[in-house]
From Swiss-Prot:
GO CC annotation, single: cytosolic small ribosomal subunit
Keywords in alphabetical order: Cytoplasm, Ribonucleoprotein, Ribosomal protein
Family indicated by similarity: Belongs to the eukaryotic ribosomal protein eS25 family.
InterPro entries (alphabetical): Ribosomal_eS25, WH_DNA-bd_sf
Gene3D superfamilies noted in UniProt: 3.30.63.20
Principal location class: cytoplasm
Name of the featured protein: Small ribosomal subunit protein eS25
PANTHER family: 40S RIBOSOMAL PROTEIN S25
Gene for this chain: RPS25B
Subcellular locations according to the entry: Cytoplasm
Length: 105
């Protein structure tokens, strides 16, 4: 077998520009999700909505409040603690990462 001839940098660059191969195949089309525009400061309107709507939910957690009320996660955690102190919701499971509540009986 004959020894392989070394290409110069210029020859390598020209070969790369010439193409020949398709671009790298993507796994999926990649649906882009819009950035959430949730509020981070509680106004009176959202506070009233929390007091009115949350006691009717059968399952209450931080993610439920974030999805339904469009508030930030830290704001949802504070709201859940406040509602628990007021006796509006009762804890089902309190974990370091997740807190699950239900409506008070």
């Amino acid at each position: 077998m004959a020894p392989k001839v070394q290409q110069t940098k210029a020859a390598k660059a020209a070969a790369a520009l010439a193409g020949g191969k398709k671009g790298k195949k993507k796994w999926n089309k990649g649906k882009v999700k819009d950035k959430a525009q949730h509020i981070v400061i509680l106004d009176q309107e959202k506070y009233d909505r929390i007091l009115k709507d949350v006691p009717t939910y059968k399952y209450v957690s931080v993610s439920v409040l974030v999805d339904r009320l469009k508030i930030g996660g830290s704001l949802a955690r504070v709201a859940l603690r406040q509602l628990e102190e007021d006796g509006i919701i009762t804890p089902v499971l309190k974990h370091s990462k997740q807190a699950i509540y239900t409506r008070a009986q």
